[in-house]
Each structure stands twice: as C-alpha cells, then as structure tokens.
C-alpha cells in the first residue's frame, strides 16, 4: 500500500472590530397565537421584513394562551405568559420594538422601517457577543461576552437569555388560523424570565449558560438570544443572537490568550490527519484554511464568529 506523507500550509485569519462604534441590534418582540386570524394575515408581513434585515434585527415570538389552541404556548405556559404580561400585550398580534416602541399596528413595512431606524439612531452603551456550541448528547453551551462601554445611568438593568427556535413547521395547522410555519418561537428563558442583574460599571463580563434541548425542539434550529433591558422603562439597551462553533472545533479554554497564535500542526508531516491549535485574543470572524504547496486551497476548517479563547481542530487529508 502506498503511504502518503502530507505537509501543508495552514492560514489563520481573524477579523475583529477595534475601537469602532458599538453596533445596535434592534429587538422585535411579538405576541401571537396559532388560532388568531389577524395573526395569520399579519405575520407574513413582519417575517418578510425581518428576513430583509437579519444583520441588525432580532426577533422573539411569544405565543399567547388566547384566543385559542396553541401548542407553542402549551410547551412553556408560565414563561410565555410572564413575557407577554411584561410587554403589556393584551391583544394579538402585538409587536414591540426594543421594549419602548409599543404595539405597532397595523403591520406595515413603513411602520417597521420607522421603528427600526428610530432605534438605530440611538448609540447603544454596551455590546453583546453570543457564541453557541452543541454539546454531545442533548445540550447547548452558550458563551456570552457583555462589554459595558461606559458606566450606565441609574436604572434597574437585567441581562436576559432565551432559547429561541428559528423555525417550527407543522404538517397540519396546530391551531384554527391555518398557519403551519412559525418563526423565532420563544422556547425558554434562563435562569428565568427575570434574568440576572446586569453590571452597570464599564468593563467586560463573561457568562456561560448550558441548557438542555427539550424533546420537542429541533436541534439545528435552536439559537440563544441575549439582551439587556432596563426594567424602569423597559428599554432594551442592546441585543444579539448566537452564532455556532462548527462541529469539530473544540474550545479548549475561554481564558483570553496573551497574543494571537497559530501553533505548528502536529504531527507534521502527517498521514492522513493532523491536529491544529490556535488562539484568539479578541472575538471576531475567524477563518482557518489549508493550502497545498502550489497555493491551492485544500480545505476551509473554520469560517465563523468565535470568541476569545484557545481552540483545536483536526484536518483529515483523506476527506
């Protein structure tokens, strides 16, 4: 049998934003129900608008107990009710934007544009970075970095973390309004809907949440949404949603390294697989590619947002 020995060029690229203005992600929270006729008519307008603004708009749909049957409400009635009541939702559909632009109605592109642009004009005092990782078995690990740029003024600030299912599809309508497709459905809040106290002093704060995927949830559709909200006036200061660490990338430690590094792969030369370690001092979009001796790209091992930390992955030349 012919033995092949491989020696390849491995390139690590990290794109980070340094000393730039913090980007606002605008949070749209809707109350809806699978047996609500106006919801069936209005939701497509909101969903279409959101899909055209994915870069800076985040949505969570809370399913109410009324006016009729809704299995997404029944899956977590207590927390769904708590968020609906917190948002002063007394009729469906109701859409609030960043907690302080209340009850957009009717649902129109112009109304959503106006609310969105109004909030984008407000510079956020903090940023949130969320990275999700599937844990073998039945869990998701969410690593969150909260950066408070300046000391916050007086207020009651809460840091809230929620599991959201991006898409739920039924073969037949689960309620009476004919809808079979539901987007960004609220599933559960951690540790609860109250959240935890948000630090008000400028600095960087790290959080890790590991939660189980419940039986009804579709694994690949779950994403973590995190936001900071002032309970005094319900304003959302900023929000973000998780990006996933690709399968096969191991986060060795979340300890921030002293400097960026791409270690020599081992073994080298190798046949047919090798391990690659790298370190990031800041979170950013990370690309890790393998090239042959002729400069041709052989494989793209990483192409995603990663947080600061040390990582390891494997390249297998046999495919």
Enumerate the predicted regions with their spans.
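Surface-exposed coil/turn segments at beta-strand junctions on protein surfaces, enriched
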Residues: 19-21, 135-137, 152, 200-204, ...
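Hydrophobic alpha-helical segments, especially N-terminal targeting/anchoring helices
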Residues: 16, 229-230, 291, 295
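Local sequence-structure signature of Cys/Sec-based thiol-disulfide redox active-site neighborhoods
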Residues: 21-62
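Residue-level signal for well-ordered, solvent-exposed loop/turn and beta-edge residues enriched
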Residues: 37, 179, 234-235, 294-297, ...
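Short, conserved sequence motifs used for protein processing/export or organelle targeting and
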Residues: 48, 55-247
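Bacterial Sec-dependent N-terminal signal peptides
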Residues: 1-23, 247-254, 261, 278-279
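C-terminal outer-membrane/trafficking sorting elements
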Residues: 253-319
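Processing junctions and N-termini across compartments
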Residues: 14, 30-33, 89, 314
């Amino acid at each position: 049998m012919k033995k092949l020995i491989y020696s390849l060029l491995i390139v690590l690229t990290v794109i980070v934003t340094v000393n730039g203005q913090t980007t606002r992600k605008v949070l749209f929270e809707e109350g809806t129900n699978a047996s609500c006729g106006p919801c069936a008519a209005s939701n497509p307008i909101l969903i279409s608008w959101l899909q055209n603004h994915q870069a800076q708009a985040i949505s969570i749909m809370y399913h109410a107990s009324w006016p009729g049957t809704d299995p997404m409400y029944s899956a977590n009635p207590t927390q769904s009710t708590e968020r609906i009541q917190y948002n002063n939702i007394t009729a469906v559909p109701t859409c609030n934007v960043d907690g302080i632009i209340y009850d957009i109605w009717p649902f129109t592109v112009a109304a959503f544009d106006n609310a969105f642009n109004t909030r984008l004009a407000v510079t956020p005092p903090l940023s949130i970075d969320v990275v999700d990782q599937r844990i073998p078995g039945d869990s998701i690990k969410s690593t969150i970095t909260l950066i408070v740029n300046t000391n916050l003024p007086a207020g009651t600030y809460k840091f809230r973390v929620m599991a959201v299912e991006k898409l739920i599809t039924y073969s037949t309508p689960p309620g009476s309004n004919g809808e079979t497709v539901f987007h960004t459905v609220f599933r559960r809040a951690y540790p609860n809907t109250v959240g935890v106290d948000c630090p008000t002093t400028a600095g960087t704060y790290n959080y890790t949440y590991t939660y189980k995927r419940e039986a009804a949830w579709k694994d690949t559709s779950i994403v973590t949404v995190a936001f900071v909200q002032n309970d005094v006036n319900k304003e959302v200061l900023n929000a973000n949603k998780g990006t996933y660490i690709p399968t096969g990338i191991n986060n060795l430690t979340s300890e921030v390294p002293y400097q960026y590094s791409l270690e020599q792969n081992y073994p080298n030369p190798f046949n047919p697989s090798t391990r690659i370690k790298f370190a990031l001092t800041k979170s950013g979009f990370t690309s890790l590619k393998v090239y042959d001796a002729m400069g041709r790209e052989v494989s793209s091992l990483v192409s995603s947002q990663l947080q600061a930390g040390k990582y390891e992955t494997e390249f297998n030349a046999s495919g």
